[in-house]
């Protein structure tokens, strides 16, 4: 089965130029039409699919449905590990809650269907993160509405046709964005095709506090915020209260519903059963002062007067093989476990008593679920800056960029300040939202069940594209 999509390139370019460079985006445009489908009929995306198709149409092998299954298309990009992790958490929650009622596709439309720079965002992001000043300029420089509006309009001008093909391939009944740049063009495509009344489009924000303004689009059916702070930002950006829900950051079900026993875990992981343990992480890429902090911990967790350790260390090096090799060849004063990229972090977190990590939202949310006091030792400028006060102000941890001071804090918690460690642990558990991913998919299911969900997309390309220059 194929459908034939009328080529939108010229019409889309005309509309983008009209919306951005003239008339302030106030013109009304006729929707593009799929063959065998009248967009004005309001039949939704499913109704746009035909049993037959003209030659040269777009094949739809991925979007075929079982008898009553609904297709969910989750849009993401591998700019950092958090977006994919949230997307896969949502996918797994749909399967657990609704079984075969939904087919879930996790896709990077930019990489699969777009050209530069959409298909190169992962490499570009990693380069800028290694040069944090460059990333800081990029983050704040694109925050003004007119700047990112022009940028997104240019992307729509060149790649909207490809986005149409990508969306149509998966025949979605629901579209979920877990990335700030995976909203504007797809939303406008839905509006252009007259499909927005039947296809709920929701955003799941994956930053705990400070968010780039491109996260907040007026046209979404629902905006799921991980915290009250993010919800306030959404309101300031013009979203309606009816569009906003605060459930927490989606964490994979295998983590948030795992029932773990610390003693059993330490036995399984070959750890000392009697010594308190600190988990040291640098994210998936092993970034930050991991080596310096590990060596400081080795010194501070060794009682030289009694000649015995007062704690043990678990270091997660991620994909950083150089770091892992360096640490494995080192001598230590205390028991140390050196690990690479781990897929079962629930076990290592469950076996430890506190964590030292950079301020990544996913790691913070997981640590809170496990009740681990957090020492934040680094952050990415822009989106991770606000995660520090989120943890510190809620009494779930402390911040220190000095490896030696972080190690001393752990030593105090493990010896003379055990009550403080317990207090931080209780505060972490209070701040945790382990059911967030299930609350989100249940709410999306309710949206899909409604007879006529309307995404509030303006007739201009998007709210970000409408400017007079």
Swiss-Prot record:
InterPro entries assigned: Diacylglyc_glucosyltr_N, Glyco_trans_28_C, Glycosyltransf_28_UgtP
CDD domains in alphabetical order: GT28_Beta-DGS-like (cd17507)
What keywords does the record list, in alphabetical order? Chloroplast, Glycosyltransferase, Membrane, Plastid, Transferase, Transit peptide
Asked if Transferase is a keyword of the record, the answer is: yes
Q: Where is the transit peptide?
A: 1-42
For this chain, the family text in UniProt reads:
Belongs to the glycosyltransferase 28 family.
Q: What is its EC number?
A: 2.4.1.46
Summarize the protein's role: Involved in the synthesis of the major structural component of photosynthetic membranes.
GO terms of molecular function: 1,2-diacylglycerol 3-beta-galactosyltransferase activity
Question: Which reaction(s) does its UniProt entry say it catalyses?
Answer: a 1,2-diacyl-sn-glycerol + UDP-alpha-D-galactose = a 1,2-diacyl-3-O-(beta-D-galactosyl)-sn-glycerol + UDP + H(+)
What Pfam families does the record tag this protein with? Answer: Glyco_tran_28_C, MGDG_synth
**Name recorded for this polypeptide:** Probable monogalactosyldiacylglycerol synthase 2, chloroplastic
Gene Ontology cellular component terms for the protein in this record: chloroplast membrane
Question: Looking at its record, which EC class is this enzyme?
Answer: transferase
Q: Which residues form a coiled coil?
A: none
Which locations, inside or outside the cell, does it occupy?
Plastid, Chloroplast membrane
Q: What is its main location?
A: plastid
BP terms from Gene Ontology: glycolipid biosynthetic process
């Amino acid at each position: 089965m194929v459908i034939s999509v009328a080529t939108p390139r010229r019409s889309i370019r005309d509309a983008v130029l009209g919306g951005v460079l003239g008339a302030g985006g106030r013109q009304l445009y006729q929707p593009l039409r799929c063959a065998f489908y009248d967009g004005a009929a309001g039949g939704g995306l499913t109704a746009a699919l035909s049993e037959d198709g003209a030659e040269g149409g777009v094949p739809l092998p991925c979007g075929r449905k079982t008898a009553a299954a609904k297709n969910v298309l989750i849009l993401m990009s591998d700019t950092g590990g958090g977006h994919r992790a949230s997307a896969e958490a949502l996918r797994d929650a749909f399967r657990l809650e609704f079984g075969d009622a939904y087919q879930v596709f996790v896709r990077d439309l930019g990489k699969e269907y777009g050209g530069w720079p959409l298909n190169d965002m992962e490499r570009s992001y990693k380069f800028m993160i290694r040069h944090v000043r460059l990333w800081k300029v990029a983050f704040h420089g694109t925050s003004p509405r007119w700047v990112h509006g022009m940028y997104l309009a240019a992307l729509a001008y060149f790649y909207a046709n490809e986005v149409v093909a990508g969306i149509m391939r998966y025949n979605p009944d629901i579209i979920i964005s877990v990335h700030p740049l995976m909203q504007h063009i797809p939303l406008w495509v839905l509006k252009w095709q007259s499909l927005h009344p039947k296809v709920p489009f929701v955003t799941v924000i994956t930053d705990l506090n400070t968010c780039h303004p491109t996260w907040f689009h007026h046209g979404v059916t629902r905006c799921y915020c991980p915290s009250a702070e993010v919800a306030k930002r959404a309101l300031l950006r013009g979203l309606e209260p009816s569009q906003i829900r605060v459930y927490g950051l989606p964490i994979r079900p295998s983590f948030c519903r795992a029932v773990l026993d610390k003693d059993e875990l330490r036995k399984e992981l070959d750890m000392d059963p009697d010594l308190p343990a600190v988990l040291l992480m640098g994210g998936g890429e092993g970034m930050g002062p991991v080596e310096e902090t590990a060596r400081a911990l080795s010194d501070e967790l060794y009682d030289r007067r009694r000649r015995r350790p007062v704690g043990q260390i678990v270091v997660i090096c991620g994909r950083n093989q150089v770091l892992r090799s360096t640490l494995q060849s080192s001598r230590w004063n205390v028991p140390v476990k050196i690990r690479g990229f781990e897929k079962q972090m629930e076990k290592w977190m469950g076996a430890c008593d506190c964590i030292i990590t950079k301020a990544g939202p996913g790691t913070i949310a997981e640590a809170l679920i496990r009740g681990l006091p957090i020492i934040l030792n680094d952050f990415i400028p822009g989106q991770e800056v606000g995660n520090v006060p989120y943890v510190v102000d809620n009494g779930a941890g402390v911040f220190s960029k000095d490896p030696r001071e972080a190690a001393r804090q752990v030593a105090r918690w493990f010896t003379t300040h055990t009550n403080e460690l317990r207090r931080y642990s209780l505060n972490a558990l209070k701040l945790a939202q382990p059911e967030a991913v299930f609350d989100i998919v249940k709410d999306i299911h309710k949206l899909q069940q409604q007879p006529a969900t309307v995404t509030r997309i303006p007739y201009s390309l998007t709210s970000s594209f409408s400017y007079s220059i």
